[in-house]
Amino acid sequence: MNSDRIIKKYPNRRLYDTEVSRYITLADVRNLVMDCTSFKVVDTANESDITRSILLQIMLEEETGGEPLFSASMLAQIIRFYGGTLQGMFARYLESSLDLFAKQQQDMTKTLGDNPFEAMTRMTQKNVEIWADMQEEF
């Protein structure tokens, strides 16, 4: 059984979330991504999977709306991999690197809590206490 949430894209460019039975925006789709909700976007005209296309639209909005994640140089380098002999390897490398980075970020958040500065401050204070105790012993 496929557990992906189905979002239908109609010829009028509107997106319809079949799980909540209402039209949604790209911002709503972005929220699904941020909530790690698995979904698939299907073009109703030909039943093709257009999930990647919708995700790229969201990335484009993010890149033009605020602090860009990708520099022009980085984008140019990525484009150069298209059609090359290393395209598949590069795609797997990027995906593996992002997976590792996300796991490390999750582990760090779990270890340090929601406020890493507070955790670092506590750690520093504890180290100062240990040093003070050691100095008193000598």
From Swiss-Prot:
Signal peptide: none
InterPro entries: PHA_DNA-bd_N (IPR012909), PHA_reg_PhaR (IPR010134), PHB_accumulat (IPR007897)
Identification of the protein by name: Uncharacterized protein in phbA 5'region
BP-aspect Gene Ontology terms: regulation of DNA-templated transcription
